[in-house]
Amino acid sequence: MNKKSYMKIGILLMVGLFICAGCSAQQGGKYTVEDLDNLAEIKIYSAENNELIKTISDEEQLYQYNQCSLYDDSDTEEHQHKLEKDLEGAKEQYYMISYKYPVARFGGEELVENTTITLYEDKNIIKMTVSGESIKGFSVPEEFLVFYYEVSEEEMNFYHSLVEW
């Protein structure tokens, strides 16, 4: 494998860690910042006019959002290109931008953009763009921060329910 493939695999692993929350939270209880993997809020925008539709900060919804399993270790560079090609001409429907609490305990308390998930009309493929500012310590070229995933109908219904909740 070449250096490019190793970098993509490394970033996919990091993204998996960003998205997956620990299983230690108990249902019905209050979630800690760690349970939510530092996720603070999600803003949902219409892709048609970039209008803010909704801001989600409810802990239960944030926890469920974190539980969506986007990472598929069978994804290869070729599969990513196939999914990207499958989206050609597809109409973007919503942007879901997730924000996390800053890692530093001191200093700015401004939320940090983490990922943007793009939903498409009549497609079970989503595009996830990792924000460059969410990766500390080194710069990653933008082309390595965009991932495509086929999601189940159940997961797609969940994403759409966030818009309607």
Regions found by a protein language model. Give the residues of each.
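C-terminal motif of bacterial Sec signal peptides marking the signal peptidase cleavage site
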Residues: I19-G22
